Amino acid sequence: MASSSYTSLLVLVALVTAASAQLSPTFYDTSCPRALATIKSGVMAAVTSDPRMGASLLRLHFHDCFVQGCDASVLLSGMEQNAIPNAGSLRGFGVIDSIKTQIEAICKQTVSCADILTVAARDSVVALGGPSWTVPLGRRDSIDANENEANTDLPGFNSSRAELEAAFLKKGGLNTVDMVALSGAHTIGQAQCSTFRARIYGGDTNINAAYAASLRANCPQTVGSGDGSLANLDTTTANTFDNAYYTNLMSQKGLLHSDQVLFNNDTTDNTVRNFASNPAAFSSSFTTAMIKMGNIAPKTGTQGQIRLSCSRVNS
């Protein structure tokens, strides 16, 4: 069984490598030279209006790539959007739809929704003060979505460190450092009370007591009461993309159980310490991991399609 699993992983890595080799940062230079500027403008406007939108677009990209690859399947109405990790919490669809409409007006059926979402994730990080990176382009859009895979493959807010590592390794090419670096995306954004209630009411011992008490003020213990109340994932610089997430973990101020397990007398502690003390190391590792994640099983060539509307397949 172990040998079979290892062989399957090698096959997945080979397929990912082959597909990602067909991507290029210059893919739209001739066919739609205004594409990247249009995406950037749309993201900047959205994040300026609502800083939380930066985290929402970044999360949308993550939830897309972890389910059958970076193919914009998460943007299709229903299906993956109804999966337990996504229902009632994914945001940013309107921003992507608006950008797609603008691009269709200048380059009809040329730029994929998958590429728009991937670039928008990068531009969201930059808009909130984070690092930039070169995005390989040329992804095509899926013609289906997979709710079951979304339920099984997306890491949960109560995941253990081992479960997180398994989820990332399963995607081919992502390692433990990538996992810790990508978790640093929680330096921006918010989470609902229902995702951290158990942690602040005695479910976890590795939480700062004063921090837990402050969270209880807006997150009642009773299930069904205040479930949607929001708290910042980063308690210090919520709307700035920096390395404060890691210093928070070292103070036992990780909002989610799946955050704090990264610094809990375990194998990832040293990586957290490194990112907390060295912002450049975090930025470098994060951008590397984002490129690797963006290269998970892209559809290229004649695979899939270029959707006219991101929320539905072409008729």
Curated annotation (Swiss-Prot):
* Assigned keywords, A-Z: Calcium, Disulfide bond, Glycoprotein, Heme, Hydrogen peroxide, Iron, Metal-binding, Oxidoreductase, Peroxidase, Pyrrolidone carboxylic acid, Secreted, Signal
UniProt-listed GO biological process terms:
hydrogen peroxide catabolic process; response to oxidative stress
Residues recorded as binding Ca(2+) 2, renumbered to this chain, are T187, D234, T237, D242
The residue range of the signal peptide is 1-21
One CC-aspect GO term: extracellular region
Q: What class of enzyme is it?
A: oxidoreductase
User: Which compartment or compartments is the protein found in?
Assistant: Secreted
Protein source organism: Hordeum vulgare
Record Pfam families: peroxidase
- Main location as per UniProt: secreted
Reactions it catalyzes: 2 a phenolic donor + H2O2 = 2 a phenolic radical donor + 2 H2O
Family designation? Belongs to the peroxidase family. Classical plant (class III) peroxidase subfamily.
Glycan attachment points: N158, N265
Q: What is its EC number?
A: 1.11.1.7
Instruction: Detail which positions bind heme b.
Output: H186
Q: What does this protein do?
A: Removal of H(2)O(2), oxidation of toxic reductants, biosynthesis and degradation of lignin, suberization, auxin catabolism, response to environmental stresses such as wounding, pathogen attack and oxidative stress. These functions might be dependent on each isozyme/isoform in each plant tissue.
What does the Swiss-Prot or TrEMBL cofactor note state?
Answer: Binds 2 calcium ions per subunit. Binds 1 heme b (iron(II)-protoporphyrin IX) group per subunit.
Where, in this chain's numbering, is Ca(2+) 1 bound? Answer: D64, V67, G69, D71, S73
Q: What positions constitute the catalytic site?
A: H63 (proton acceptor)
The GO molecular function terms of this record are: heme binding; lactoperoxidase activity; metal ion binding
Which cofactors, if any, are listed as required? Ca(2+); heme b
In its UniProt entry, what is this protein called?
A: Peroxidase 1
Site entry: Transition state stabilizer = R59
Disulfide-linked positions: C32-C107, C65-C70, C113-C310, C193-C219
Residue list for modification Pyrrolidone carboxylic acid = Q22
Which lineage ranks, top first, belong to the organism behind this chain? Eukaryota, Viridiplantae, Streptophyta, Embryophyta, Tracheophyta
User: What residues bind substrate, as annotated?
Assistant: P155
